[in-house]
Amino acid sequence: MTPEALIDTDRWPLDNTALHEQLHSIFCAENVVVLPGFIRHEYIDELVRESEELMTVSHRSEVNGKVNVVAYDQFPAHSLLRALYEWDGLMNFVGKVLGEVKLFRYADELGALNLSSMIDGDYLGWHFDQTDFVVSVALQPSISGGEFKNAARIRSADNDNEDIVRAVRNGERPDLVRVEPMTPGTLMVFNGRWSLHQVSPIVGDVTRHVALLAYDTKPGTESNQELKFTRYGRMPA
């Protein structure tokens, strides 16, 4: 199976300039763009089965939350998620969404592609990202909880907005927080550098699986050593 076969190109034509411009406009305005049904529904079960198998080799990370993480070097050669990440067609499409940007896959043997798997009681606390954008593919939601909560554009390069950030963290400004839809098959491009975000606690015995695909506007990007140890518990072999 080719990576392109996984994608509903009738709904999301990857080479459509008008679509690129529309999605880029949304991303610029909201720091996030959500593409529901990007992955064809008939392939979701297969991707979930792959995720369940991968989870058996995951590392348990408990820094600012609780999550099981599968690193890039743990995805086998036949992995559909790996094939999707390594396909230039998807990378180029994301670059169009970002505004005609040339992208490169991470050179990080651990962080280029991750699977984030969260079980009952797991969560991610409020945080900002260190990168301008993250690409995710939602594969399976939990029975309850597991909401991706986003206080969009709450700070900027010129204003840390510390009082508002503190208020959101303390639950005092729910009016600034929205929940991004993460139904199975959804592709999301998200700028977490300026938007405070979290994942609410998982409830129930169904694992929440999300694939995280790392690209950058320059070649050779790697995660720093501290992040590698805290997220994967090791350095590359």
Task: For the regions a language model picked out, list residue spans one by one.
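Intrinsically disordered terminal extensions flanking catalytic oxygenase cores
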Residues: M1-L14, M235-A237
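Non-heme Fe(II)/2-oxoglutarate
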Residues: R11-K96
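Hydrophobic residues positioned within well-ordered beta-strands of beta-sheet architectures
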Residues: L35, F133-V135, A211
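Short strand-connecting beta-turns/loops that link adjacent beta-strands
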Residues: R40, T131, S144, G204-D205
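Short beta-strand segments enriched in hydrophobic/aromatic residues
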Residues: S51, L139, Y215-T217
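A structural signal for well-ordered alpha-helical scaffolds and beta->alpha junctions
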Residues: W87-M91, D132, G192
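Catalytic core of non-heme Fe(II) oxygenases with the double-stranded beta-helix
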Residues: G95-E100, F104-V189
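Catalytic core of Fe(II)/2-oxoglutarate
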Residues: A152, D158-A237
